[in-house]
């Protein structure tokens, strides 16, 4: 029997509970889950690649007793990485209509590049629909509590990475 390999790609800067929810649910759809941590030169990540890989490896550790999980960095065209990994499906999480529009277009292009690879969309659990890495970073930068959006380890990493940022100067 052919092993069902799924690939869940993302920047994971930082890793959120929404990402974790999609990983947990995706792990039930396959025999092996590969989490691809993207190097995206167009983005200016808060965390380096090694830190992002470590964050993901930490949260997927509990899955490893029931499914094979691998965390790999990648750069370049996603479909090439999927092919290299031998995956037959790309997993994407959807929070809102705006996500769908973008992901629908990407899925269509990936299908044109390789029609043998399916894109599987998982709707975000309602409690995670408003969580976005971009917003988590912004809240953390402004001194807000992000513990309800990320794991304790990621919360600590955010605090440590932002410790050098001083309080904003008051205009009075």
Please provide the spans of the model-predicted regions.
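Short, glycine-rich nucleotide/cofactor-binding loops
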Residues: 6-18
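Residue-level signal for inorganic ion chemistry
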Residues: 16, 56, 143
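Short, surface-exposed acidic-centric catalytic microdomains
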Residues: 20-78
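Acidic beta-strand-to-loop metal/phosphate-binding motif
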Residues: 36, 88-97
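Charged helix-capping and loop-helix junction motifs
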Residues: 50-52, 102-108
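Short, flexible loop segments at boundaries between secondary-structure elements
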Residues: 115-130
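Short, glycine-/small-residue-rich phosphate/pyrophosphate-handling segment
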Residues: 131-150
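Single conserved hydrophobic/aromatic residue that forms the stacking wall/gate
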Residues: 163-172
């Amino acid at each position: 029997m052919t092993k069902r390999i799924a690939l869940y790609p993302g920047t994971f800067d930082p890793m959120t509970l929404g990402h974790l929810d999609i990983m947990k649910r995706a792990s039930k759809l396959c025999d092996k889950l590969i989490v691809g941590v993207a190097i995206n030169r167009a983005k200016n990540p808060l965390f380096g690649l090694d830190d992002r890989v470590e964050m993901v490896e930490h949260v997927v550790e509990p899955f490893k007793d029931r499914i094979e999980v691998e965390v790999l960095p990648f750069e370049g065209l996603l479909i090439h990485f999927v092919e290299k990994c031998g995956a037959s499906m790309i997993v994407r999480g959807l929070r809102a209509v705006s996500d769908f529009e973008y992901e629908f277009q990407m899925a269509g292009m990936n299908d044109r590049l390789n029609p043998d690879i399916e894109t599987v969309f998982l709707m975000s659990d309602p409690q995670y629909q408003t969580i976005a890495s971009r917003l988590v970073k912004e809240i953390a930068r402004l001194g807000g509590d992000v513990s309800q959006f990320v794991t304790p380890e990621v919360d600590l990493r955010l605090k440590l990475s932002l410790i050098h940022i001083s309080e904003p100067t008051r205009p009075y």
